[in-house]
Amino acid sequence: MIYTITTNPAIDYILRFDKFEDGATIRANEDEKYPGGKGIMASKILHNLGEKPVNLGFVGGFIGEYIANSIRDLGLDEKFVRIKENSRINVKLKYDKETEINAKGPKISKEEVEKFFDSLKEIEKGDVIVISGSLPYSLDSDFYKKVIEKTEADFTIDIADKKLLDYLAFKPLLVKPNEEELGKIFQTEINDENLVEYARKLNELGAKNVIVSLGAKGSIFVDENHAYRAKPIEGKLVNSVGAGDSMVGGFVYGMVNKLDKIDAYKLAVACGTATAFSPDIADRDMINQILSKVEVEEIGN
């Protein structure tokens, strides 16, 4: 079983404009609403690949119920803890640029946190937990560490700062920093010459597998024995939201379904790229189209 954790989910409210002018009244050409949050994004791609992940986390108020209902309408399972305060709405403005306005999110009480930890009792050894995203301001900074300690499951972790190092001793199945984040973790500038070296440091510190996304330059995959680079695939960028989460979901799907690591990496690349070329999380047809174009080359060992 695969579980995803979204501690601070949102309605992602997307507004599309031809042109944005600060201080003016503007009518959007289109607007869309999706359940948002990194764990939810990973769940959606896993569902589109044929898995049945369970969404865990916190939702509250009418916004939270909209999120939960939207997830169920997609055919996804959810066991969110209901909290007193409202979940958040994040606004994403899309014109010739992309601007995101993310709300702070609700305060979560100690009693609500304990309910969440109780929900972890059903997770068994051999299950996989996808942990991603920043924590709400009211949760302790070691919240994710407690999740890991309370279960015997494999886990992936995708968080954007140096705190990632604190989780490597628990031997995560996958970590997925981008190039900029990798540099911040080790307080250095990453370039083509040292990219594999610093990705490998994450292996040496405990990560079983590492994917570093490089934007338009593609990505690399590193484990304890090999390093591979996926060439970038040409196409029109439609949506940057959820591409990284789709990569994580694709890799987890591959590992759960006993694919070779390199095939799991190829699927991760296909999922991330397909989502970037789609208005929402990519469907299976789009993933398959992109998968046929994925090329990887070994770049070291």
PLM region spans:
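Structural motif
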Residues: M1-Y3, T99, D127-V128, N209
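Structural detector of well-ordered beta-strand residues that form the stable sheet scaffold
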Residues: V54, K79, V130, T156-D158, ...
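Short, conserved phosphate/pyrophosphate- and ester-handling motifs at nucleotide-, phospho-/glycolipid
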Residues: L46, N178, G244
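Short beta-strands and strand-loop turn motifs
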Residues: E100-N102, G126-G133, K176-E181
